[in-house]
Amino acid sequence: MPNTLSLTLSAILARRDWENPGVTQWNRLEAHAPLHSWRLEQPALDDAASASRRSLNGVWRFNYFPAPEQIPEAWVTEDCADAVPMPVPSNWQMQGFDTPIYTNVTYPIPVNPPFVPQENPTGCYSLTFDVDDAWLQSGQTRIIFDGVNSAFHLWCNGRWMGYSQDSRLPAEFNLSTVLRPGENRLAVMVLRWCDGSYLEDQDMWRMSGIFRDVTLLHKPETQIADYRVVTDLNAELDRAVLKADVALAGAGFADCEVVFTLWRKGEKCASVSRRPGSAVVDERGSWDERLTVAIPIDRPALWSAETPELYRLTMALLGPQGEVLEVEACDVGFRRVDISNGLLKLNGKPLLIRGVNRLEHHPENGQVMDEATMRRDIEIMKQHNFNAVRCSHYPNHPLWYRLCDRYGLYVVDEANIETHGMVPMSRLADDPRWLPAMSERVTRMVQRDRNHPSIIIWSLGNESGHGANHDALYRWLKTTDPTRPVQYEGGGANTAATDIVCPMYARVDWDQPFPAVPKWSIKKWIGMPDETRPLILCEYAHAMGNSFGGFAKYWQAFRSHPRLQGGFVWDWVDQALTKKDEKGNAFWAYGGDFGDTPNDRQFCLNGLVFPDRTPHPALYEAQRAQQFFTFTLVSTSPLMIEVQSGYLFRPTDNEVLSWTVARDGKVLASGEVTLAIAPEGVQRLEIALPELKAGPGEIWLNVEVRQPRATPWSPAGHRCAWEQWPLPAPLFIAPPASTGEPPVLTQNDRILEVTHRQQRWQFDRASGYLTQWWRNGVETLLSPVTDNVSRAPLDNDIGVSEATRIDPNAWVERWKAAGMYDLTSRMLHCEAEQHAREVVVTTLNVLEHRGRALFLSRKIWRLDEQGVLHGDIQVDIASDIPKPARIGLSVHLAETPEKVDWLGLGPHENYPDRKLAAQQGRWTLPLADMHTPYIFPTENGLRCDTRKLVLGAHQLNGAFHFSVGRYSQQQLRETTHHHLLREEPGGWLNLDAFHMGVGGDDSWSPSVSPEFILQTRQLRYTFSWQQNP
């Protein structure tokens, strides 16, 4: 250890600890469970704020330097004259200094471990503060930095105190010897890059600074240094033993004792006391400073994500005279996690992981997470039927785990290790020089977090290949904590360093035989020889932009194959940052918007929620697929359904099933039943229906489960599950349409014109298109009605293609190469016939690119005596071109309807491979709500399986998908950010007979399942269109 008295700033800079993988800290205290040092038991029991902890969050003084060598030597003892205020916690890039960098795989610095660039942005923080005189008289005062990116040196009152790296775990230092009465000064030199940055190559914004809490903690001379709590349940789960281990420190602990008291809901359950000294450990004896208790508990209330039953354990350290020296406390959850018979189990029952990956991200605050945002994340997750979260890819803020304990979420706690940009990826994992750094990131995480019942799995990190260092750390984990399984995806997801087969983006039925690390279909994987472990996808369903297609297919597999135990969606929140344009207007920015290089553009936008936590439509698909109730239509006569509960541990004590029978959205009958279902139980319900009268339209039975009472995570009336089925309808014979005045055809060399009362249609002979429709003398079209075979590319269509790199296999590149974004229409035939009751216009167009025919579109337009336009359209597709994104029509309407009314799937956006959550019904929304404001503009807003659409005066009937909004497909295709879109007059209507799925198994390879790709080379569709007075 260096001599602290001789360490000048220049000496520290010369030593360059931040480029030495063998140096991860100087003087940093050992990791331990979070400590509060209450001095009375009651506040510890109540989890009240401890007077022994003092937050140093607030406004510090700050200077930014492009490199540490530019820091003046005097800064250690006094602020620079040009120091500015800096909020702590914060990332300095969010405060106007330096540049945030978004990159996924590529390191943001040249890869030359352990060395980092000489230009190493450095933030110099300082704070003056006073200390309570009583703290100076006795005991120990520490400072705790919960998170500093990426490394820092610390001074107090001009004295160098130490060094630390690892951005996501606490760094704690003893300041007792240097604190003084009156004013004290902290100085913290934070480096943007260090050798540890090579272990922190996560897919996220790369930012710097003191971004988590800073706290002073005062401990008595004799103190509780650490504690560990383990619950041991018998096979019947009706008896438990609470095992608690405490380590003491300081002078005189041999004469002390610790009183352990277990509480539940304020009532004392048990209390025992112990003096220091462990049982004999080996031939050299026992631990003098440690003590262990085992407290038997009969019929414990068990913890699970469904029933987060918590006890409170207080540990009071008593002095020789029985005086309370300090108290530590923690929440305790009695649960057992194990893997048996190839299944991950909690309390003896196989789990189904409804999980999501979550990075700590806030659009204004960067990587600073406040309690309100954490709570909001958990509440939204649970409202949408998530029961698990993976801390991707680093240990989270300490409060996160306490909230997961209390709300009820299963947690994968993941070490801050990712070397994705290394070639090979396992380069550092197989290098013994990097074992100490990797080891600290695993062992310190466990020492901090092991008492949380919500943590059911440890993870060795992410995307770092597989090497000997991983094997060593796996063995350490299994020895240190045999109560939890370990997972690690690197090296193929099924190495000896994982208890769970945990692939990312493996598909349901399709093998991906990559060299060295094949990804088999998940169904195949669990049946491979000698593979007996459960399979839980550590990442799947890449929710980038308008994506998430095929999610229901995964859940069909999970529910059908017991050893397919779910997975973690990638990911929770769009990682966009708030930025202001040249006019001062805020918008959400992604990679490259700050001039950052390298960058991966919008690949940071993979969330189920927008940065402000507004849901993406995909979130509803997740909610529906993961719902805890499944429904079966047993019979229609009598009408009987079966409801099965997917809850493993709780009965339905707050659930009501409501049902309606509706014809074309109009409710014919309804009812409500209180559910009384045991865990994993079934309830059969017979629904008494009145006689249904014959009438036009489809009849649907809709059921939904709501929770009438509010819960800690949801409001009263929260809808948690739903289903619907079509019912047989009484035979209905539609009356013949009334006759009216027939339309009249007039024509010349340029146009065909049809007139009916106050309406007039005009077809252009040169193009063959319907170019105008007058109603009451007013033009209602701003563009012709044209064929539409392309869409503004989705992220999944683009894949990895960008300006400097082209993936010829990406859908968008195939469409571009075929000319589908640059088609011209050539009229081959256009004629009209006057009939007694109608006018028929027949057109034939070829859609071609540079003289090559891609599509042939034949349209038969019938205008009847009711003034209704009937379309009968057949499209033939060339055999040697890529499958199209859509087949349909597009038109720019002059009217801007205030609302949209439709009979079909809704109410939210849905696509052919992402429509499980949508329901058949009649829906009405404002026009603005028909648009989904994806940050990177794409095709959006589709509603599938529509039978009737009303847009102001326009009414369309048939069987089609549609989208309507203020932006053309061309504008969506050419615009890079949502805030740059400009509303166009009127409204754009896209009417689709076919629309390709959006895909979503991943976003870098074609992932639309074949059943959602047009397999035929000819498609015919019909519809009717009228304008109401």
Swiss-Prot record:
Binding sites annotated in the UniProt record for Na(+): 203, 603, 606
- Gene Ontology MF term list: beta-galactosidase activity; carbohydrate binding; magnesium ion binding
Binding-site positions, substrate: 104, 203, 463, 539-542, 606, 1004
Where, by residue number, is the active site?
Answer: 463, 539
According to its UniProt entry, the protein's GO biological process terms are: lactose catabolic process
Keywords assigned by UniProt, alphabetized: Glycosidase, Hydrolase, Magnesium, Metal-binding, Sodium
**What is written in the cofactor note of this entry?**
Binds 2 magnesium ions per monomer.
Q: Which cofactor does it need?
A: Mg(2+); Na(+)
Which InterPro entries does this one have?
A: B-gal_small/dom_5 (IPR004199), Bact_Beta-galactosidase (IPR050347), Beta-gal/glucu_dom_sf (IPR036156), Gal_mutarotase_sf_dom (IPR011013), Galactose-bd-like_sf (IPR008979), GH-type_carb-bd (IPR014718), Glyco_hydro_2 (IPR006101), Glyco_hydro_2_AS (IPR023232)
Instruction: Point out the annotated site residues (description: Transition state stabilizer).
Output: 393
Superkingdom of source = Bacteria
- Residues annotated as binding Mg(2+) 1 are 418, 420, 463
Keyword Hydrolase assigned to the entry: answer is yes
Q: Which Pfam families match?
A: Bgal_small_N, Glyco_hydro_2, Glyco_hydro_2_C, Glyco_hydro_2_N, LacZ_4
What Enzyme Commission number(s) does the record list for this chain?
A: 3.2.1.23
Q: Which reaction does it catalyse?
A: Hydrolysis of terminal non-reducing beta-D-galactose residues in beta-D-galactosides
Pull one GO CC term from this UniProt entry. Answer: beta-galactosidase complex
Which PANTHER family has this protein been placed in? Answer: BETA-GALACTOSIDASE
Q: Which NCBIfam families match?
A: PRK09525.1
Q: Which family does it belong to?
A: Belongs to the glycosyl hydrolase 2 family.
Q: How is the quaternary structure described? A: Homotetramer.
Protein's recorded name: Beta-galactosidase 2
Provenance organism: Enterobacter cloacae
